Swiss-Prot record:
Its cofactor is Zn(2+). The gene is alaS. Its main location: cytoplasm. It is an enzyme of class 6 (ligase). It comes from Chlamydia trachomatis serovar L2 (strain ATCC VR-902B / DSM 19102 / 434/Bu). This is Alanine--tRNA ligase.
Amino acid sequence: MLSNTLRSNFLKFYANRNHTPVASSPVFPHNDPSILFTNAGMNQFKNIFLGKEQTSYTRATTSQKCIRAGGKHNDLENVGHTSRHLTFFEMLGNFSFGDYFKQDAISFAWEVSLSVFNFDPDFIYATVHEKDDEAFALWEKYLPTDRIFRLTDKDNFWSMADTGPCGFCSELLFDRGEKFGKAASPLEDVDGERFLEYWNLVFMEFNRTSDGTLLALQKKCVDTGAGLERLVSLLAETKTVFEADVLRHLISKIENLSGTTYSPTEAKGAAFRVIADHIRSLSFAIADGLLPGNTERGYVLRKILRRAVNYGKRLGFNRPFLADVVPSLVDVMGEAYPELSASVTQIQEVLTTEEEHFFKTLQRGGNLLQQVLKSSASSAKISGEDAFKLKDTYGLPIDEIALLAKDYNYAIDMDTFEKLEVEAKERSRKNTKKTKNDSDSVFQDLDPTNTSEFIGYDTLSCDTFIEGIIKYNEIASSLEEGDEGAIILRTTPFYAEKGGQIGDSGEIFCESGTFLVSHTIAPKAGLIVHLGKLSQGSLTTTMAVTAQVNQNLRKKTANNHTGCHLLHKALEMTLGEHIRQAGSYVDSQKIRLDFTHNKALSPEDLLAIETLVNEKIRENDPVTIREVLYSDVMSSSEIKQFCGDKYGDIVRVVLAGFSHELCGGTHAQATGDIGYFRITKEHAVATGIRRIEATTGEDAENIARGQDVDLNEIATVIQSPKDQILVKIRSVMEEKKDLAKQVADLENQLVQQQVKTLLTSCEKICDTSYLVYYLTEEEGQRIQHYANAIHKEIPTNFISLWITEKNGRYIVLSRVSDDLTKRGVQAHTLLAELLAPYGGRCGGKAISAQGSSAELPQIEFLNKTLRQWISTQLA
């Protein structure tokens, strides 16, 4: 693959010029709410550009996995319908953090263009910002002035988001010749088809704040980005990015699966392009730990998948098919991105599960759409309210609604639909908007030099000094008795909450006062904040104090954290290597671990996992902490790291028996310290995500003892020896089953006898028999039995209406024989019209519906109403 060669040669070029090759970060940013997905190579270096983080290197080069499908950079709707838009792409880049600036950046770019990309220099053009005289002068060394263009902010000022690093940029373009347009220069090339941009050099000089102010960065930096797919297309001289290399390989696989030949100019061509692109976004996102869902990134991922499925239907795919494309993707990209190869099973399982669910949604929504079409027959137009309900409530995409409506020559009230869409998005935005609370703001406003040294790995107590105090969300100089607030220490043994582990609690004290620490947090890098209340006396800044962590709670939390590591490894060994941690929480009482898995764990699975963890506890292996180079971890398959987590050059590895994980938390000294491990609960938390809750030590023993007490009580109640409880319970259950069958048989006999009487009470109109009948409250418990029995006796041309009372409300059941539903008679329509005047509500299908109402008329009136309704329906 040409892309593999280009990627490798690009990285080698910069590595040979003292750039550190840095692995691609995941396709979603870590702790950055300003963007949904990683959309540029510089995302992982944002804090370095801002001067918030330090790194051992000042030059870097990457090939970054990117997704643009949400937020400011959103290409989703264009994919498939243009020659270059993609949701997933690779961004080649080189970066300078206060090292070189414009001169070397431009010099390198020119050399790469000629020696790595093999472009003819006579066809290269450059643009610069209209105010960037320096960049213009530098390009004059390589290009004639008539091939250098000055442009405005719109084209040559770059920013990652509304806030953050930004600066002037310079773009490189390649002239593809007159067959791609008659424009004589980039200024005339409105569509950008002839003079194709292939590289953007961003000169980071500013940090844009939320009010739009441009502040000078502490260090001038360089960020460049060249889209790999676009480069491949240029070198292969294809009209679109889809006709070369990886994407064409995927299209070939889709051709094979669908039995349809790809033609770029035919309408079906868009379907091939959409699927080829979307399978990459989906696969890499899942490999990096994301899953389709109903909110934020998960929602976008689900939207991408459903868009691929909808386009797949145009190629004849009426069953899950995306998983079948994944191996072809791994064949061509798995070597460059090992996480893709390691996650094949997980990717395929998630895709198939989501597709199956969506096909069911389409079927259910399609049935509802048929009802909407029928009710809209007079206007031949689907209302915006109905279209929105089908999409919002039943998950039927508007594209699917439009296609089905087109088949019936129906229009859709898109103005109302779009208005409702906007209103829904606004409600969602208000509900999910994360507002920065006052205390967070205070922490950000603290002096940057006001940092804390953490020494809590080695000690639980130390003498230190108060560096800062916060009271009532404001910076203060003192705390008085009863005040709630926060204290910042120069040195602290308190572990701040992170990595899923709760923060420490304890005391900060001196002769003047005692501060009870309830929780410890790290609101920003280098800052540890102790939250709590002053129980007695007073404390002031600069005061010498003693910091003492609650030893018992720390020990129990550490044991649980090590237990969580053992659980994670046991899950992988029991269920398979597809297991990925999707979240965790550890405190002194419990372990909570979320992991990727598509089905509930059996009792046998849970027992095997619990047994394996306890075996490792009994082996009493020492828990060893090592600090190693992250580059060494990247080359090791034995050490677990977590997608989305950001790591520095030196990382902390926790070795606990068979478990090897990157972790910054506190741990037991040996696995035997954990004592005993017990799973307390296992359940689903989202599609493809399961959760295990567990505990260790004394808490686990208490659970076991409690269950033993329960067994003794059960044995007493059922009058059975303890070792015979299960036998006795099974015997009782069999007896209960037999009795239930006898009761059901008797009830059925009673129903049958009464139905024979009711047959003589049926009336008739328009060749249709009907019955309205009140059941007593006791009879009402068998309301469905009555309806089933009489409709079995009268299988055609029959409508029945059953009424009973329960908890002060009328319960109403309507039934319609199957042959009448084919003539347009609907049970739910009948019941809805019947209950509407009385404020009742109902739900159901064409053949059967049930509802309730606080009021109902006499049976004679209902009988008359039903008779009139049948006459109207079947006239």
